[in-house]
Amino acid sequence: MKSNYSATNIKILKGLDAVKKRPGMYIGSTDSKGLHHMLWEILANSVDEVLAGYATNITVTLDLNNTITVSDDGRGIPYEIHQDSNISTIDTVFTFLHAGGKFDDQSYKLAGGLHGVGASVVNALSDHLEVTVKRNGQIYQSVYQAGGKIIQKAKKIGDTTSHGTTVSFHADPKVFKKAQFDSNIIKSRLKELSFLFAKLKLTFTDQKTNKTTVFFSTSGLVQFLDEINNTVETLGQKTLIKGEKDGIEVEVVFQFNQSDQETILSFANSIKTFEGGSHENGFCLAISDVINSYCRKYNLLKEKDKNFQLSEIRQGLNAIIKVNLPEKNIAFEGQTKSKLFSKEVKNVVYELVQQHYFQFLERNNNDAKLIIDKLLNARKIKEQIKQQRELKKSLSSPQKEKILFGKLAPCQTKKTSEKELFIVEGDSAGGTAKMGRDRIFQAILPLRGKVLNVEKINNKKEAITNEEILTLIFCIGTGILTNFNIKDLKYGKIIIMTDADNDGAHIQILLLTFFYRYMQPLIELGHVYLALPPLYKLETKDRKTVKYLWSDLELESVKLKLNNFTLQRYKGLGEMNADQLWDTTMNPTTRKLVQVKLDDLINAEKQINIFMGEKSDLRKHWIEANINFSVEN
């Protein structure tokens, strides 16, 4: 059947309709990440007032119904009738795409909200939004509903001696479904901003918990790096480099450490560039060139030795890169601004870092020796891993099958996106899972031996020769560390399914530590999940009602509604029969899965070091600060 294609098929989306039709083009997604991006857009406008030198306080409030409010003490959005829209400037900013104060080269010399769509996009994707502006001794207010429809045009509602802008919005549940603001994600971002702008006061109030947190830093990026380095053993001193060229301001602080994990955070005009870009490229290239030049000058690399690759140098490097660029120079890839694409900044960052870091190493020979000795040792380990990879390649199919024999129960489908790998604790639960699964798309891998704590080993060779770890590597297929290739992934979902007890939780942490250290992109790309088996089975005496419960809170709620029932507490997966395990934990339509996310890299690194590392004093401190040992009768 052919369809007609004519002029009537061409649609012109007016006003904010384009945003409502394709929200992902403007905020990246309509899940939790997209919801928080809405907040970042409004927050960026307040931060632009800080960049311009007019604001010193920002407050964020999350109320009980998921409405969020951002307030600053900047200049306030102008109220006057706009010459092009013929409505107030406040309403223009919130109802017209590409309307803002960042285009005239005068109001903001530096700004992060450059596309002029942030405020209007948030309005388009909210079912309610209010703007209150304090400016020139007067208070103005606008109210919008249903995706930007003006309910109350901007009007004067009072007088004031203060100044600033307050925006409150409630995201449209039709767009964001069940997504909720996460106070931990918000606090993490505000904490970053306090480090980026020393002496800026940021206050967050979560009305759900009735807690207020204040973020304030006196030493900026140096304090930020100290926070990142809190749980690692550092090598030498911190290096702080500041400079300016052609109107581009650069501030970089970095330090090497004994681990092999890198944390490189970059910001452009206060916008966090998750995917890096030209400023990161300039920094990394400069560090690489300086270290290799230093090694050649002092014969620390033999003539036959190859230069250190950037991937080698970045291991154990923690760095924060902050650049401020004039509006004419700055360009981001995409509306979500996750990657900086300004060509000029790469050269400026490179020149400043290259010049100052070489001088730093010349003045601090002991620091240079510590760093380069570590790089040489890491190169030896890399060679060992390469040999192990060659061993893997050399294994014939029968040999690989021998390693997996009696362990992996494969599935039938060949489509990676549909395949699920359940990593199960022990043969007992593994046997039940094999019987209860859907063989078409679900594979089962029981773990028989103890999972290695990779955080406590000194040599990576110990990890890649451990039988359980080697089995995981073969099953998943991507390789590890620098040899990781997501294209070789064999399963769309990797699901850790353990007992709902302390031992099960410990196995989860051991496996997550391995994935985080050796296969981090699996987590970053959303392939790792935790299965949630129920804690209780409740059945009425007449056997007409059977309920599975996942928490004590659910249990107490059900007890109020039902009488005459029997209750079974599951101590392990093996206590369920195959049908029960399928219904509660494996069936995609009824199960509960938790996707493991890496929203806060710094906090993840810190938690891994605390719980799985060698420093018992860190664990003791965490327990004392977070666990209440009081007993209630």
UniProtKB/Swiss-Prot annotation:
Naming one, the record's GO cellular component terms include: chromosome
**Marked site positions, Interaction with DNA:** 450, 453, 506, 619
Q: What Enzyme Commission number(s) appear in the record? A: 5.6.2.2
Q: Name one GO biological process term.
A: DNA topological change
Q: Which residues bind Mg(2+) 2?
A: 499, 501
Keyword terms: ATP-binding, DNA-binding, Isomerase, Magnesium, Metal-binding, Nucleotide-binding, Topoisomerase
Could you name the domain of life of the organism this protein comes from? Bacteria
- Please give the subunit comment from the record: Heterotetramer composed of ParC and ParE.
Q: What does this protein do?
A: Topoisomerase IV is essential for chromosome segregation. It relaxes supercoiled DNA. Performs the decatenation events required during the replication of a circular DNA molecule.
State what protein this is by name: DNA topoisomerase 4 subunit B
| Organism phylogeny | Bacteria, Bacillati, Mycoplasmatota, Mycoplasmoidales, Mycoplasmoidaceae
UniProt lists the gene as parE
